[in-house]
């Protein structure tokens, strides 16, 4: 949210990316993506400061993706750690598709189409950002012109928060707490979180540095983190009580956010207007980049 005051920011509703992994279930795609935009607005993303747009409404993304695919070696894509991990974890769907293998190329097009100088990412996305830089460098080298800059990563103080089950946080794994989550569901989800595997009995001293529950305290209750860690190491607080306190902290943290979100839900027409205006603005910038690229490739 603070980046809006320092950079010209673009926030993209990645519907094509969503279809790459959920191609068999397009029914709820639109509603889910609009829900994401409402989350952004709720948390402080402002259409007066930033551009919010829908990926599929700016066709230049697809065009640059295709052109990048011509110059991207297969080996670059096959070595992506996220690709290998998701193939292993995908038990109920087939992700061994051309589209899924190539989604980092589309991601590169999403970034380089706007000649982004910086990208806010989590640690798990750093390999993808490096691949984006490699694709940009290769294009610049092949066609003897530095069109694309090397986008730098913007990491937060907590660059990675694991999912409730200790894996990468992902909608695909359903291991997250949504902004719109009801209090009873928050409590149930936190209750099921993985804790210190070495702590079997209450009297066993804990190891908060390896406990996923404790990592959430660092983000949502930093004022309690050190005390909770000390109590855990001395076996003066059990995992159940630790989870209960965290759950109530999250419920309280989300309460005003959910109130604001419910107000935004009442005016979905306004959300679509914001996205329509943003998509037009993004399209104008994207067309300039594509025109430049086509000139280098003798496609005009």
How should these model regions be labeled?
Residues 1, 13, 37, 58, ...:
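Extended aliphatic helical segments
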Residues 79-81, 116-117, 125, 172-173:
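A short secondary-structure junction signal
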Residues 1-109, 258, 262:
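N-terminal Rossmann-like or analogous alpha/beta NTP/dinucleotide-binding catalytic cores
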